[in-house]
Amino acid sequence: VVYNFGTFDFNTPNFLAEFVKGNLNYFLSVDYFQNFILQYQYEGRSIKEQVLNLTAAEKLKWQNALQKNLEGNNRYYLYNFITDNCTTRVKDGLYQFTSNQVPASDIKSFRVHVVEAPYQQGIPWIGLGIDLLLGAVSDEAPSPFQAGFLPDLLYDQIASVSSTNSFRLVV
């Protein structure tokens, strides 16, 4: 089973305008793993696997929370590029339902890491877009907790995490 916090409805009236204004609801969806893989392959998207060293109790807490999030309006959230997106939802769960500590971050600003992200390469206007969407926030240095707001940044952050019992989070 795959839980996906990055689901949205393209049929939302004024989709692009609502996204730019920060008024777009995203939602949690669930699918069979094989269906998820086939959809990503069809769309030409990549998937990176990261195996986590979680206890049975941590897995159960997280799974129960995900199931509760699927109920009714719990599944919807107002998308925010930095503080509440499909990546931050995973990050928040990881630190809420495990005994792991957030590692230090050397990120200098939100803008630098968005513009330099591998999936943004070759898009010359991305800096302007970040300025328009984020305003002055784009030049702020994120806290260690905020630093995992993009998939690649969270992937790297998780790879460096150890739990309070000294076990590595990533197997």
Language model regions located:
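A structural motif
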Residues: 54-67
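Generic structural motif
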Residues: 6-10, 57, 137
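Glycine-rich catalytic cores of cysteine/serine-nucleophile enzymes that process amide/ester linkages
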Residues: 1-45
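Acidic/histidine-rich, surface-exposed loop or edge segments in extracytoplasmic proteins
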Residues: 39-48, 67-75
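Helix N-cap and loop-to-helix transition residues
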Residues: 32, 55, 109-111
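Glycine-rich phosphate-binding "P-loop"
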Residues: 51
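Activation targets extended, charge/polar-rich intrinsically disordered C-terminal tails
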Residues: 68-171
